[in-house]
Amino acid sequence: MYLDEYKKWLDSTMLSEDEKEELRSIANDEKEIENSFYTNLSFGTAGMRGVRGIGKNRMNKYNIRKATQGLANYIIEATGETGKKKGVAIAYDSRLDSVENAINTAMTLAGNGIKVYLFEGIRSTPELSFAVRELKAQAGVMITASHNPKEYNGYKVYWEDGAQIVDPQATGIVSAVEAVDIFNGVKLMDEKEAIEKGLLVYVGEKLDDRFIEEVKKNAINPDVENKDKIKIVYSPLHGVAARPVERILKEMGYTSVYPVKEQEQPDGNFPTCDYANPEDTSVFKLSTELADKVGAEICIANDPDGDRVGLAVLDNNGKWFFPNGNQIGILFAEYILNHKKNIPANGTMITTVVSTPLFDTIVKKNGKKALRVLTGFKYIGEKIRQFENKDLDGTFLFGFEESIGYLVGTHVRDKDAVVASMIIAEMATTFKNNGSSIYNEIIKIYEKYGWRLETTIPITKKGKDGLEEIQKIMKSMREKTHTEIAGIKVKEYRDYQKGVEDLPKSDVIQIVLEDETYLTVRPSGTEPKIKFYISVVDSDKKVAEEKLAKLEKEFLNYAENL
């Protein structure tokens, strides 16, 4: 089957000679042919993400055009002339092939008579979300693979509220994409004709200014004193966030910001880090070296598309401490609840089913509402829309994913590292003014609410074989349930595929033990990985740490021996 598909592509008149040469280069590598052609590159409810290359299971201009034709067909069917006139905003990051993919997206939409607003250069994911709202566009497309390795690129779709697509749009667009013939079903228009017909408009600096203007409004205490006294090292990890983040920090008065020069320029090869993910502490090597040199107490790093933020902060012994996504999330929650003025009675904070249970404790003990949604920031965006439409009672205060994604404000409907970086600088300054630090404030939260500690173990399983292994693990976990794990009785077994509470069905399994340990397993929606989440709690720090170490070993052993 996959060999037939390989031959079909090799014989296609649509491919250039260079593309055919790329295919010929793998002629003797059947495993690579299989991985490139055994299935269509999945266009799921989160869009599309995959390894760059030629093949129907690879990210390339043909799959980009197919996806965009499906999106165009859906827009025309669902919204008619109105949607065509409202148009689609397109942005792209610094990854390899991102510019070409953005242009192919634009030319396919124009070929279908749909107006396009294309950024004239690289921009962040949150600014794309903002642009959809600001331009009152029908939809948006972001060309990015976020923090994936350099071999990847991706395609994310947003709807008119600036959030990534959810149902009914998600299933409608997926069906429309699947119906498109990759070579013969696509309508294209060249750039010159699109501009002449008013179907292609380039956008840039005016939207940048408006975006920064709206981000500033979300500062909790914009007038905090001694901003010039806090020294911050900053890195965009070769991505797109340097311009907006350095600008916002400067305009807000943080004058002692030291960029990591080796990582400041956009470069899709990510030359200083194999994996440009701020969750990975190794990416902070250059940052902490610079911080030691200049005497900075905090390092901020963003992922390549500028929607996520990681930290390195000094502990009380002058050593670097790397708070995880949950720790940064609870820090935001506690800070906002204690420092934001005029919080409405129905103020609500939102996180996902795999984030720390400590979040709910903090929010509820401060008299506000905590909501949980499935993983994917689009579900947080969906709740914000429901609040605005009065379909749900609440006023959005803060949302986060444990994978270092945060949003304060409603100026965008996706995670935003620009606003998050600004507020992190504010928190660090506020704490320093009070004789404290980010590290100390995290410790205070644990001392106040209990030592709820977490770890996430991602296991990579590449290619067709890897996908089958992941599916086998999830199947076994559903079929072979145990009454106890690591000697602790199972209190509750939640299979989100069968439906839990009022959440949509999802491939997630969560086990709650009698001692309030949470064990969660899910396949990643964006990478060839299966993720194991462990969350333990105890009033004593040492006991909690020992419990976490034991369960890390026992839970993986449990999963492997199902």
Language model region names:
Residues A296-I298, F321, H339-R522, K529-Y533, ...:
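Phosphate-binding and adjacent anionic-ligand microenvironments
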Residues E81, A89-Y152, K250, T255-G310:
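N-terminal small/polar loop signature for handling phosphorylated ligands or for N-terminal nucleophile
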Residues Y6-T105, E193-I195, L200-I230, V240:
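An N-terminal, well-structured beta->alpha segment
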Residues E120-D181, N277-A301, I330-I336, T348-F359, ...:
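Phosphate/diphosphate-binding loops
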Residues F37-N57, A145-N148, I232, P236-I248, ...:
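Conserved phosphate/anionic-ligand binding catalytic regions in large, soluble enzymes, centered on
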Residues N101-L109, Y152-W159, D307-I328, F359:
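Short Gly/Thr/Asp-enriched flexible loops that form oxyanion-binding sites at enzyme active sites
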Residues E32-F37, L41, N153-V283, L290-A291:
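Gly/Ser/Thr-enriched, mixed-charge loops and adjacent short helices
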